[in-house]
A protein has these predicted regions:
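Ser/Thr/Asn(+Pro)-rich, low-complexity disordered segments
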Residues: 1-308
């Protein structure tokens, strides 16, 4: 939300500058909206969730219990790195937090990657809506290699793009269920991951690093029925096969549609949202955090198949 507000403020300011040529009154209204967005963003207090001892953010808080959750966001390959960077850039926390985030690296089929918790496209790619990336930087290479790993894992003539999404299971009210799906090579807990649910929004996010492959995959998704009246459906569940080999999760989630629209906007308009966010002076002053090099001789880990013992 913080990055959205800051980016929206930049867009409104740009529009105000253009509107001044035709309507001074309208331009003034746009400026007021931009100032309001900026004020809301700058009033946010990140420190409430920050653990100064561990230099990490808590996952959240329990209002029922009146305390913070004991778990933390401790991986660099996480959607939370957008929050981490924003909090550092706007002087809410110190830059030591960035270097406290785990950089656990492994050799996946698509290349060297940082481990994420669930191996989802959301964890790797969502921040790229707002971050400019530099080829050969760790962020760019890890995100691209994560996408390549998912591409290589896809069966022949089947689409790719695994992330957290709805799937073809229902509760008592016949609402689709939701959980994280990820690639086992990328996830810290591979034994818990299913990778047979394809989320079209995950492919749209991949436009940031593999635009040609993503466009071809989106074309395939549309050909096999993933597009509906209001855009791309939530998911294709290959674990709940019907006569065509999968079941379509015919729902639309606002945040997935929003991320998709932003990613498409970036792809068509020279990374416009990222350029706006990165143009803010506080962000520009800290951009070197995003350009960290891929380590020449990283510490790697081996992954093992988890076995379940039935008693």
């Amino acid at each position: 939300l913080f990055a959205c507000l800051i980016t929206t403020a930049c867009a409104l300011a740009e529009c105000a500058g253009q509107a001044e040529k035709t309507s001074a009154e309208f331009a003034e209204e746009l400026k007021k909206l931009a100032a309001r967005c900026t004020a809301i963003a700058r009033a946010m207090d990140f420190s409430v969730l920050y653990d100064n001892t561990r230099e990490l953010f808590h996952i959240g808080c329990s209002f029922e219990e009146g305390k913070l959750t004991p778990s933390h966001y401790d991986l660099l390959a996480s959607e939370c790195r957008l929050t981490s960077f924003s909090a550092i850039a706007f002087s809410r926390i110190g830059s030591e937090h960035w270097f406290a985030l785990s950089r656990l690296m492994c050799d996946a089929s698509g290349g060297r990657v940082l481990k994420s918790w669930s191996g989802t496209m959301f964890e790797y790619l969502m921040p790229l809506i707002f971050f400019e990336t530099v080829p050969y930087s760790m962020q760019f290479e890890v995100c691209r290699n994560a996408v390549l790993t998912q591409i290589l894992a896809a069966a022949a003539e089947k689409p790719w793009g695994v992330s957290e999404s709805g799937y073809y299971a229902f509760d008592d009210a016949l609402r689709y269920q939701y959980r994280a799906f990820g690639n086992p090579e990328l996830a810290l807990a591979p034994g818990r991951m299913r990778s047979d649910v394809i989320a079209p929004y995950a492919c749209v996010l991949a436009l940031a690093v593999e635009p040609k492959a993503a466009a071809e995959n989106l074309r395939l998704l549309c050909q096999i029925g993933a597009a509906g009246k209001y855009g791309l459906y939530e998911a294709l569940d290959y674990g709940a096969a019907e006569k065509n080999g999968f079941a379509i999760v015919k729902s639309y989630m606002a945040h997935h549609q929003g991320m998709s629209l932003c990613a498409i906007n970036n792809a068509l308009n020279n990374n416009v949202l990222a350029r706006r966010f990165m143009s803010v002076p506080e962000v520009r002053a800290n951009e070197q955090l995003l350009f960290e090099n891929m380590p020449v001789d990283p510490i790697r880990i081996k992954t093992y198949e988890l076995s379940l013992i039935h008693i």
